[in-house]
A protein has these predicted regions:
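Short, small/acidic-rich helices and loops at N termini and domain boundaries
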Residues: 1-24, 28
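Short beta-strand segments at enzyme active-site cores
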Residues: 90, 143-148, 184-193
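Pre-Walker A adenine-sensing motif
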Residues: 42-52
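Conserved P-loop
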Residues: 54-132
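N-terminal pre-Walker A segment at the start of P-loop NTPase domains
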Residues: 30-44
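Phosphate-binding/switch loop-helix module in NTP-utilizing enzymes
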Residues: 120-183
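Catalytic P-loop NTPase motifs of RecA-like helicase/translocase cores
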Residues: 96, 152-153, 197
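Phosphate-binding/switch region of NTP-binding enzymes
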Residues: 168, 175, 179-255
């Protein structure tokens, strides 16, 4: 079975896009949408978040390779389509069609039609992909995924001695995505890679304090065993930070 994602392959160019501020009436309508949560279909994870992923904000999920970041992205995308909305998926990691079919199940082909995929090949193209979201965000889009936000950012750091320029560009991308999420009421999910903190010990998410500030919810993923993972609330506006939930990665998704 072949999947027919709506892949975007336009020439990537930076566009100057001005944000449109809402009147108070439009803001009230938008706030009504933002209050709703998007279920992931994974009960432990939804309960940890108070019912699901919050719309109108950026949620960041970080962790080492193989902790389940992309699995969460795919499953949340599938659940969003099942609820009648479209998904924009900015893929810098190489989305596996096989894994998508496993999680989406027998309706994978139909679900794929409601997922618009961008496949940037550089940090600059990633920027253009994020900017493109504004053009179609009003077309019943319920979720925007950026998996991963920092894979190309890592390469940029190699040519940026201080890292200031790269961090600023990354913050601009995610800040713009957050503004669009607020404006249109969709859920925004980004994944992040980690680095070893030689001073404080352990691992920390890439991107610095700016990315942490923009992300209103942050989840840290940890391996706890063969196929089992722990999700820890690193940051949340209304749930206790440090609380955690265990989930399992199965052939059909996360449970």
């Amino acid at each position: 079975m072949e999947l027919s994602f709506q892949k975007k392959t336009k020439n990537y160019k930076k566009n100057i896009i001005s944000l449109v501020f809402h009147t108070s009436l439009k803001c009230k309508k938008r706030c009504h949408v933002i209050e709703k949560l998007l279920s992931s279909g994974c009960k432990p994870l939804d309960e940890l978040l108070g019912g699901g992923f919050e719309r109108g904000i950026v949620t960041q999920v970080f962790g080492a390779a193989g902790t389940g970041k992309t699995n969460i992205c795919i499953q949340l995308a599938v659940e969003c389509v099942k609820q009648g909305q479209k998904v924009i998926f900015i893929d810098t990691e190489g989305l596996s069609p096989v894994r998508f079919k496993q999680i989406a199940g027998e309706n994978a082909k139909e679900i794929a039609r409601s997922i618009i995929i961008y496949e940037p090949l550089s940090f600059e193209e990633q920027y253009s992909s994020v900017r493109e979201v504004e053009r179609i965000a009003g077309e019943n889009v319920g979720l925007v995924v950026l998996d991963s936000a920092t894979s190309y950012y890592r390469y940029e750091l190699e040519d940026d001695e201080t890292g200031i320029k790269s961090r600023r560009e990354l913050a601009n991308q995610i800040g713009f995505l957050h503004a669009l999420a607020r404006k249109h009421g969709f859920a925004a999910l980004i994944t992040n890679q980690v680095y070893s903190d030689v001073v404080g010990g352990g691992v920390r998410p890439l991107g610095g304090s700016s990315l942490e500030h923009i992300s209103k919810t942050i989840i840290r993923l940890e391996k706890t065993g063969e196929g089992t993972r722990r999700a820890v609330l690193y940051k949340h506006r209304s749930r206790p930070e440090g609380s955690s939930a265990e989930f399992t990665i199965t052939a059909e998704g996360i449970r």
